[in-house]
Amino acid sequence: MSRERTPLTEVPGRSADVVHLKKSAELAALLEAHKGERHAIVMQDYPDPDALSSAWAHKMIAAKFGIECCIIYEGRISHQENQALVQLTDIELLRYNEGDDLKQFDHTVFVDNQGTTSKLTDRFAAIDVKPLVIVDHHEIQDRIEAEFTDIRKIGATATIYTEYIREGLLVLKKTEPQKVMLATSLMHGIRSETSGLIRGGIEEMEAATFLTEFIDQSMLEDILSVKRSKQVMDVIRLALDNREIRDNYSISGVGYQRVEDRDSIPQAADFLLTEENVHTAIVYGIIVKGDREMVVGSMRTNKVTLNPDEFLKEALGATETGRYYGGGRRGAGGFEIPIGFLAGISDDELNRMKWHLYDELVKKKFFAKIGVGGPAQVSRSETGSLRLEE
């Protein structure tokens, strides 16, 4: 099968429609050749609506070819909209726990990621369960290879799966509740990746138009109207209090956060982006999971000439093995920096000093990338939050 990774909209001498149809036919032929197998659909450790809906679509398509699939992830689903999506649609998910049997799977399928954002990538590699399919819309990362690859620079992975459905890999029917819920989840996945279709291209518009006939509008409204938790609001408040603005970039550290509240960081970045004269927001904090800690951050931008993937990779660099700390797509990005042996300190004063160190270092990286001077003088409130000196 082809491993060609050239963006499909850029294949010379051929229309996009012809190439995309070839991809759906190629996927169908591959699935037919693997009939009777059991596949693990691997999502990123912290799945979003695009990943959840795309994984579900792949599972339903694969079932037509006699392939049993399990949607699996290792982290958490903590964003309130993602929790609502899972509860309302009853998507079957498996959260990996240490010791779970992964040898039961014949192959892996990576949707909305290319193995760089899932710890399961290494777990499956260690037992020689090889990737069969990669479908994604992020920048090419070359972490893994698969027999079938469809990576496109478009708004959402859910757009690609909607296209597969439009081309006959699955038939949606308004009279079948599960198909209606799938269509609704795909619509939510596309909307969430494109700021309600504002950042979407023609592919997203066509996909949304197609899905509109099959979605449950009231369910979609229920998902979108879920209230923010108190903890999310607290993190947004911290982000507002601690933000520093330079050249229309708003950068803020929010201190230590529980792993359960990880999704509050991108929500805080979304909120900071709404401020007047801000085109890019970056929010980060230290996520604590037992004795493990890492700096986790989220970037949001509405500046059309700014590529979050390039920005984060150039600002933060990579590990000794060449794995970048950050990456992204159009309008959004994220990063993770392991803290290593400095994690797990129980002394409050040392933890305060550690946060101050990482906060200053991360800000320095971003200010250097932006090309402005270092952070303004800061003072600490009694709660340890950073405040600008006037």
Where on the chain are the PLM-derived regions?
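Non-Sec secretion/translocation targeting segments of pathogen effectors
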Residues: M1-R3, L132
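Active-site cofactor/cluster-binding pocket
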Residues: Q87, E92-E147, L169
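Flexible, small-/acidic-enriched active-site or ligand-binding loops
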Residues: L312-E314, A318-E320
